[in-house]
């Protein structure tokens, strides 16, 4: 199951299927549609290690790396974790480039400097040039990302985390 969803649902699916002697893996994907087509996505897999081992050949065809994270639901949990970093990296890059332009700096030059500095993130490679050229078209539906951010915040709240940056991110998306 490559759906980005609630880890509890993945646990429920797994329990239901396991009771019928069917293995279930929540194999969430980190990467854009283009990265998936090019085999550059990363898979984060929850479920039994035996089932993961049986499916590694399939995973190697879908992405450049696959990680067995743990039991059922852990792939879904890891996807939420990576989506926090991804969403906030994109927002931070956009804000940094806007600041560069507002301060009279060339955004393309600022991007080059940030790519060479400790501020570097792979988001700069996938979104930086697009942002500099004014192309802000999303790679995915914003409503889908907002759903993920709300799910992230629900799990953060459940764990007792304030998550102020993710709350702001949600407000921007709304």
Language model segments and positions:
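Interdomain hinge/lid region at the active-site interface
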Residues: 76, 120-174
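Small-residue-rich helix-loop
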Residues: 105-117
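N-terminal glycine-rich phosphate-binding loop for ADP-containing cofactors
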Residues: 2, 27, 40-41, 61-65, ...
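Rossmann-fold dinucleotide-binding core
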Residues: 4-87
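A general structural signal for well-ordered alpha-helical segments in protein cores
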Residues: 10, 52, 59, 78-81, ...
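Alpha-helix N-cap and coil->helix boundary residues
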Residues: 24, 109, 164-168
